[in-house]
């Protein structure tokens, strides 16, 4: 299982939100580059970065920070948030990003998504964020009438190989992942699944590992120290 420490960017700082609410933010580190280096130092093999400002604005607003992170660490970095054109995708790859996560575009701009997948294959990940089972977009501000399962099936048909699934109600809560939704998703598609939202303990990670989930994104639990990064990396290596 792959472990992805999370860095959420807002106004150039590393923050955490509670249930996706932009008004409920906590600054975890004023220096995201330093935070990335800390994660790498403690053994992280890859990083997950979200440009929260970009997710709302529809364009990357923290590109310079992302570039500095990519230059500061030697591990692969995947980035999502506000990526809605091929130019934006190419710009991220040009500054050293390993994989790009498309969210809103997956729902509203299928031609762009199809072209991106055609050009970059497994380098394109789709992020599906759900609220009460329905897909949320534009920085989680809009909730659609499309179920997360239906969108996942569409993505698989297009050729998407990896999906990041987030249950928004769990994000930043340390309440544990939504196992039921993940199980249903697993039964519905054969893509790789990366679970995000609510991961609070080593036990949560073990449970997801037992389900053969490909990867887990861990944010608040690392900052609040309810999960030790070195320990979780060791545990998943032994599983």
Swiss-Prot record:
Gene Ontology BP annotations: L-histidine biosynthetic process; L-tryptophan biosynthetic process
Keywords per UniProt: Amino-acid biosynthesis, Cytoplasm, Histidine biosynthesis, Isomerase
Active site positions, chain numbering: 8 (proton acceptor), 129 (proton donor)
GO cellular component, one term: cytoplasm
Isomerase recorded as keyword: yes
GO molecular function, one term: 1-(5-phosphoribosyl)-5-[(5-phosphoribosylamino)methylideneamino]imidazole-4-carboxamide isomerase activity
Primary localization class, coarse: cytoplasm
EC number: 5.3.1.16
Gene3D superfamilies (alphabetical): Aldolase class I
Catalytic activity: 1-(5-phospho-beta-D-ribosyl)-5-[(5-phospho-beta-D-ribosylamino)methylideneamino]imidazole-4-carboxamide = 5-[(5-phospho-1-deoxy-D-ribulos-1-ylimino)methylamino]-1-(5-phospho-beta-D-ribosyl)imidazole-4-carboxamide
Lineage top rank: taxon: Bacteria
Pfam families: His_biosynth (PF00977)
Localization annotation: Cytoplasm
EC supergroup of this enzyme: isomerase
Pathway given in the UniProt record: Amino-acid biosynthesis; L-histidine biosynthesis; L-histidine from 5-phospho-alpha-D-ribose 1-diphosphate: step 4/9
Family statement: Belongs to the HisA/HisF family.
HAMAP family: HisA (MF_01014)
NCBIfam families per UniProt: 1-(5-phosphoribosyl)-5-[(5-phosphoribosylamino)methylideneamino]imidazole-4-carboxamide isomerase
Protein known as: 1-(5-phosphoribosyl)-5-[(5-phosphoribosylamino)methylideneamino] imidazole-4-carboxamide isomerase
Gene name as annotated: hisA
């Amino acid at each position: 299982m792959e472990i992805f420490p999370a860095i959420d960017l807002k106004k150039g700082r590393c923050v955490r939100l509670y249930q996706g609410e932009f008004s409920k933010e906590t600054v975890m580190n004023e220096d995201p580059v330093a935070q990335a280096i800390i994660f790498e130092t403690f053994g992280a093999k890859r990083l997950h970065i979200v440009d929260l400002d970009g997710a709302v604005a529809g364009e990357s607003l923290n590109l310079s920070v992302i570039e500095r992170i990519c230059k500061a660490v030697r591990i692969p970095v995947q980035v999502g948030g506000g990526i809605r054109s091929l130019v934006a995708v190419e710009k991220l790859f040009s500054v050293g990003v390993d994989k790009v996560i498309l969210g809103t575009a997956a729902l509203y701009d299928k031609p762009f998504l199809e072209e991106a997948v055609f050009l970059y294959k497994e380098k394109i990940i789709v992020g599906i964020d759900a609220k009460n089972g329905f897909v949320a977009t534009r920085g989680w501000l809009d909730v659609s009438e499309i179920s997360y399962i239906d969108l996942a099936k569409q993505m698989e048909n297009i050729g998407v190989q990896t999906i990041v699934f987030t249950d928004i109600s769990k994000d930043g809560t340390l309440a544990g992942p939504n196992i039921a939704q993940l199980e249903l998703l697993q039964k519905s598609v054969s893509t790789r699944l990366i679970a995000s939202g609510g991961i609070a303990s080593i036990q949560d990670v073990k449970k997801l590992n037992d389900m053969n989930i490909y990867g887990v994104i861990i944010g608040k639990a690392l900052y609040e120290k309810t999960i030790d990064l070195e320990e979780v990396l060791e545990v998943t290596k032994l599983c």
